[in-house]
């Protein structure tokens, strides 16, 4: 499994990843999705030979904050350490950044995953997160 910079946006493979995990909100306006990828701070892909099987996308200023916007692994490749490798690669790249944040589903599975790589839920720190959609 190779983790490397995702440089050439291919709409079909990105759509495949998002659909495989049931993320459809972005797929209604693919032109915006393509712009979002182009304007991201960092996008890394996980490759099985030449096949894109996972992706992580980070946004932010790269100095004081990095926000992990997307992390997706094809279902048949999940539970094999790929998500961990993707996340750790971004964490290493931005190890000197003051804070790294993400927003995820409120399930024990996702909370356990992010805690296992060193993240803390904001409410455990006496904080609250707000979102406007």
Which ranges hold each PLM region?
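Short amphipathic alpha-helix that is part of the acyltransferase structural core
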Residues: 1-27, 125
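Active-site rim helix/loop that mediates acceptor-substrate recognition in acyltransferases
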Residues: 22-43
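Conserved active-site alpha-helix within GNAT-family acetyltransferase domains
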Residues: 84, 106-132
């Amino acid at each position: 499994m190779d983790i490397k910079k995702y440089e050439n946006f291919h709409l079909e493979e990105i759509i495949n990843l998002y659909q495989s995990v049931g993320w459809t909100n972005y797929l209604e306006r693919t032109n915006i999705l393509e712009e979002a990828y182009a304007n991201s701070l960092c996008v890394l892909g996980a490759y099985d030979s030449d096949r894109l099987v996972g992706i992580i996308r980070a946004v932010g200023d790269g100095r004081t904050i990095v926000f992990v916007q997307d992390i997706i692994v094809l279902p048949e490749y999940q539970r094999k350490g790929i998500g961990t490798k993707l996340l750790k690669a971004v964490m290493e790249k931005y190890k000197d950044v003051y804070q790294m944040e993400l927003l995820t589903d409120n399930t024990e599975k996702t909370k356990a995953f992010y805690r296992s790589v060193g993240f803390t839920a904001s409410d455990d720190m006496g904080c609250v997160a707000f979102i406007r959609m």
